[in-house]
A protein has these predicted regions:
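Conserved glycine-rich cofactor-binding loop
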Residues: 17-19
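The beta1-alpha1 cofactor-binding region of Rossmann-like NAD(H)/NADP(H)-dependent oxidoreductases
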Residues: 63-74, 107
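Substrate-binding pocket helix/loop in short-chain dehydrogenase/reductase
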Residues: 100-102, 109-114
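Active-site helix of classical SDR
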Residues: 125, 163
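Alpha-helical segment proximal to the catalytic Tyr-Lys
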Residues: 130, 176-177
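Residue(s) in the substrate-gating loop at a strand-loop-helix junction
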Residues: 147
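C-terminal helical subdomain
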Residues: 187-188, 207-253
């Protein structure tokens, strides 16, 4: 929680209209941050803002398509105009793809997943870095949303798995290249939080051995608190990688 003698820190959350992004945005607001809510669709973003209750006055809704460089530039320009700086980027926006064999995956679907999960994350990180280097005081923190799929794939998930492995490379490169500018970069790898994206797990999901089984899920609030705790560290300390998951979910080798 921020103290009264400190100006509120500024966080930007992509994919803030639903799921993990919404939960993290609400947690930041509850901890006293000013929060920029970014996502493709205005209505879910507005629902997130309203859900913040008394904290909603510190939320700014900015509809954004992270796959478009101009849209991302406008997002960060609006953040700077409204708040003058950026302390934390939660680089969260992402999407999956239908579970099909590799040879049946349309290249258009592959490109859409890469555009959102990797290029979109790069564009947001790039814009955040430019702002964090220019602001006074300099620096800030970037937290990238990885996945258990950054460690081990699910069956028929090549596009999602490949992009999440690539996010790990993005995190490492940002950490190396930007640490001397006061910018810390870490990654949180999340497994089976209760969101719309994981609803299918309650009905059963394909396993590596070919069976279909229900998988346990955890409260998304645990993820939100973990991200906010990562963000709360001073910039001379960094959680480089964190894995948070439902305790009994399949993980190593997805077994």
């Amino acid at each position: 929680m921020q103290t009264n003698d400190q100006p509120p820190k500024v966080a930007l959350v992509t994919g803030a209209g639903t799921g993990i992004g919404r939960a993290v945005a609400l947690e930041f607001l509850a901890r006293g941050y000013r929060v920029v809510l970014a996502g493709r669709r205005p209505e879910p973003l507005e629902h997130t803002r309203v859900a913040a209750g008394d904290d909603s006055a510190r939320a700014l809704v900015v509809p954004t398509d992270v796959t478009r460089e101009t849209s991302v530039r406008e997002l960060f320009d609006e953040t700077q105009r409204a708040y003058g700086r950026l302390d934390v980027l939660f680089n969260n926006a992402g999407r999956g793809a239908p579970a099909v064999p590799i040879e049946e995956l349309p290249v258009e679907t592959w490109r859409e997943v890469v555009d959102t999960n990797l290029t979109g994350m790069f564009l947001c990180a790039q814009a955040a870095i430019r702002l964090m280097k220019a602001q006074n005081p300099r620096g800030g923190r970037i937290i990238n949303n990885g996945s258990i799929s950054a460690h081990a794939p699910r069956p028929y998930s090549i596009a999602y798995t490949a992009t999440k492995h690539a996010v790990t490379g993005l995190t490492k490169s940002i950490s190396l290249d930007c640490r001397n500018d006061g910018i810390a970069c870490g990654q949180i790898d999340i497994g089976n939080a209760v969101t719309e994206m994981t609803d299918r797990m309650a009905a059963g999901i394909l396993q590596a051995d070919g069976s279909t089984r229900v998988e346990p899920r955890m409260d998304v609030g645990h993820v939100a608190k973990a991200v906010a705790d990562m963000a709360a560290l001073p910039l001379d300390a960094n959680v480089q990688f964190m894995t948070i998951m439902a305790t009994t979910m399949p993980f190593v080798g997805r077994g």
